[in-house]
Structures are given as C-alpha cells and as structure tokens.
Amino acid sequence: MIHKLLIAYDGSDSAKAAFDLALDLAGKYGAELHVLAVARPPEFGAEVETEAVIESSRRHYTHLLQPLKTRAAGLTAHFEVMVGHPAEGIVLYAEDHGIDHIVVGHRGHGLFERWLLGSVARQVIAYTRCTVTVVRG
C-alpha cells in the first residue's frame, strides 16, 4: 500500500513519464502526492553570481511545476523546489516527509557515462529506505 508518493521532476521526457505513473498510482491508492524539483547550484562563480543563478533556477522550476498542479487537481498534492544535489535532495526529502514510494525518471545515458557519473536514479535507489520505481524515458 502506498500512502505518500514522491515524484522527482526535472522536466525531462523520463520525468514526464514518471509523473504520469505517479498520478496513476496516487489516484489508485489514494496516496498523498509530493512533487519535488531539485535545482543544482552552480559549482563556481562569485557569491552574487551564484545567488542570481540559484534564484533563476528556482523561478525556472517553479514555472516548470505549474502545469503539473492542474493535472494533480483532486489529489492531495504538495509541490516544492529546492536547491542542492538532486539525489541527496530526493533522499532527504523522502526521509523528512515519511515518503514510502519514490518515482524517478532515468535518462538513457551510455554505459561509460553511467559508470563515470552514476545516475540520480541509481543513487536514490542506493541511499533511500523506501521503494523506488524507475521510469525510462
């Protein structure tokens, strides 16, 4: 049984497919839906530039989530934008909010790129305590 469902959303094709699945699951189980977008902070730059980039990222993701709110009408849904490393943000959000199921998209990177960089989906699976469903885009 799913009570609290988290969808990690970045606007990619796989995230859109993951959101569709999360909507279906939330409706089927009467689960509370949490939609989280995690913007990466810049890795370099002056403090003023960094703050401007972070604020721009927040606005971008807030705008990106807006159409999803309409699609989630009728469900108990929460939308949040945070700044940080995506996998870490997803895992911490899940722990803080008692999430029992996470849905994430997975982009089809090549084998070398997956080995070298890892993936957000892989890191979420490795570090969370709840069930994770990965949707390929």
Task: Identify the residue ranges that each predicted region occupies.
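Small/aliphatic-rich secondary-structure junction motif
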Residues: 3-48, 55
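Short loop/turn motifs at secondary-structure junctions
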Residues: 1, 29-32, 76, 98
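Generic structural signal for helix capping and beta-alpha/helix-loop junctions
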Residues: 42-43, 89, 111
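Structural beta-alpha unit
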Residues: 70-102
